[in-house]
Amino acid sequence: MAKDKKLVEEITSMNDDFGQWYTDVIKKAELVDYSSVRGCMVIKPYGYAIWENIQKSLDTRFKETGHENVYMPMFIPESLLLKEKEHVEGFAPEVAWVTHGGDEKLTERLCVRPTSETLFCEHYSNSIQSYRDLPKLYNQWCSVVRWEKTTRPFLRTLEFLWQEGHTAHATAEEAQEETIRMLNVYADVLENVLAIPVIKGRKTEKEKFAGAHATYTVESLMHDGKALQSGTSHNFGDGFAKAFDIQYTDKNNQLQYVHQTSWGVTTRLIGAIIMVHGDDSGLVLPPAIAPTQLVIIPVSQHKEGVLEKANELKQKLSAKFRVKMDDSDKMPGWKFSEYEMKGVPLRIEIGPKDIEKNQAVLVRRDNREKIFVSLDNLEETVVNTLADVQKSLLEKARELRDKKTYIAATLEEFDQIINSTPGFVKGMWCGERECEDLVKEKTGATARCMPLEQEQLSDKCMCCGKPAKSMVYWGKAY
């Protein structure tokens, strides 16, 4: 047992050093390994299995809303990238360039895609002629490259996996509907699959996506009180359409520009899961995305009938759940710590005494509760327990977020709150860029979003005292 305890103690306490705790967890839970290329990571099978389950949840919803998957090239000619000035200026510092093919210098540099708006626009300009071609509802699963200065696995890497949706519509109203529809899809997946509560809102002009008419976001709060932009949905209006000449003939035989949207989430969602639900023993995974939903641990497995019963339970439960049975020769205590580390939502212990009593012992990962259950009712109890774990994780995360959400009436009050008790701070804002910049300069916090559900906390801007236009969630962010 001393070894078991040491295993847990190898994780730095999140209260002592949250950053080191995060690093310890992703390494010891075998989610990633480091690469020889700075800022890149190897996503190991367990980490990738989490991403696959997130993918399935999203892809199902994309298809239910009429979207199709496509794939665009990895490379973008420099001339194509330069077509939308505001867009390229937003990404220029992060772009990786290909200058040679083999030994030959290319006549035109190729950008390794940081995002694919320009490629989709080129395709749409060639494939959309008539109103009958609309809407175009495309999504792409791929990796992108952004040459970040500071990196951390899952949260910010030079190359990362994501999905990017790109759609084209006949009217501004349809594009806006799509923008909000996909924002709601993200909120649904985050809350009902990942058990992460979100704030849905609109980004300020300063924080919006380069080239967008408007950017909407789902913001979540991590255990350390820092915000994480967990997904964005952009309304491009007809700006890209004009830059790339994407026109269609309407029902009156008149040429019109299309209206476009773009929306995406990345593998940083895995980082969010870790930082919202994890504890000092490791990962805590919501059952909906856990690669293994329950692990069966045979106790005194060398004794007659134990392994047979454990295998029988595995066969029975595998029809409904993602199940693993660990019959390795490691001690049960080591196994308990190992699967706690990996965040498996439910553990089933079965030993000789349990078999005699026709029972099993269930242990929840989220609250360590032990449940003694008759084998006759095992399947039903597992269903109900996993559902309760999923629900409890969301409730616990929401309680923490609400506890770490504050209100500030002045910049002085804001500064005191954000630097002593990190979290979301709600404050009124006049809408002026100068005040937004002042908040960043004085406190290091940024405007996370103007929530869709507004509150009138006061009628004055917390910075300048002028009439307020909107309530903003502010915070320090990853």
From Swiss-Prot:
It comes from the Bacteria. One of its GO terms (cellular component) is cytoplasm. Keywords: Aminoacyl-tRNA synthetase, ATP-binding, Cytoplasm, Ligase, Nucleotide-binding, Protein biosynthesis. It catalyses: tRNA(Pro) + L-proline + ATP = L-prolyl-tRNA(Pro) + AMP + diphosphate. GO terms for biological process: prolyl-tRNA aminoacylation. It is found in: Cytoplasm. CDD domains: ProRS_anticodon_zinc (cd00862), ProRS_core_arch_euk (cd00778). GO terms for molecular function: ATP binding; catalytic activity, acting on a protein; proline-tRNA ligase activity; transferase activity. Catalyzes the attachment of proline to tRNA(Pro) in a two-step reaction: proline is first activated by ATP to form Pro-AMP and then transferred to the acceptor end of tRNA(Pro). NCBIfam families: proS_fam_I (TIGR00408). Belongs to the class-II aminoacyl-tRNA synthetase family. ProS type 3 subfamily. This is Proline--tRNA ligase. It comes from Ruminiclostridium cellulolyticum (strain ATCC 35319 / DSM 5812 / JCM 6584 / H10).
